[in-house]
Design a protein with these regions (language model features):
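PLD/PLD-like phosphodiesterase catalytic module centered on the HKD motif
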Residues: 1-32, 36-162
Length: 162
């Protein structure tokens, strides 16, 4: 892995999804995702599922934290993500924002406190992709933590019905 810091601006959905894949590949310990509903990031694609699975199998200490404004899409249309949640229920946590965090509108994917993809607004494809920069990543870590604190567990690894 190259240790030089790099920053790239992205203007389209394909570039955005490719940047997400690259940042996920750089993850060694933690992945933090904040998104409106995961619909635009290719999160149900086979390749994304495989990347997450490799990350989670690399170490039992690896963690995937996801915060969404809306969870209906993941529950209804993301069977691969739900499969991962069932298989790695000790490592994946999917939260939904509370009212105070619903103003957040800039999706994030952060890997290991040093790499991120920051979409400027969930309705627009423009984004920034940064690798190997702890200083630039720090404000986004703080923002993610604020959103995480203003959220609650929303998607369980099992469905219990009568």
């Amino acid at each position: 892995m190259n240790d030089a810091s790099s920053s790239t601006y992205l203007n389209g959905r394909i570039e955005y999804q490719q940047a997400l894949d690259t940042v996920i590949e750089h993850a060694r310990h933690s992945l933090r995702i904040f998104d409106y509903d995961l619909r635009d990031g290719g999160y149900n694609a086979v390749q994304r599922y495989e990347r997450f699975k490799r990350f989670l199998l690399a170490s039992s200490k690896n963690r995937l934290l996801i915060v969404l404004h809306r969870v209906d899409y993941i529950k209804r249309d993301c069977p691969r993500m739900l499969n991962l949640l069932r298989e790695h229920s000790d490592a994946i946590f999917i939260h939904q924002t509370n009212a105070e965090a619903r103003v957040a509108s800039n999706p994030l994917l952060i890997a290991d406190d040093a790499h991120y993809v920051h979409r400027f607004h969930y309705e627009q494809p423009r984004a920034e992709w940064v690798l190997n920069d702890l200083a630039l990543t720090q404000p986004f870590l703080q923002r993610f933590d604020e959103i995480w604190q203003a959220s609650t567990l929303a998607v369980a690894p099992t469905t219990i019905g009568l």
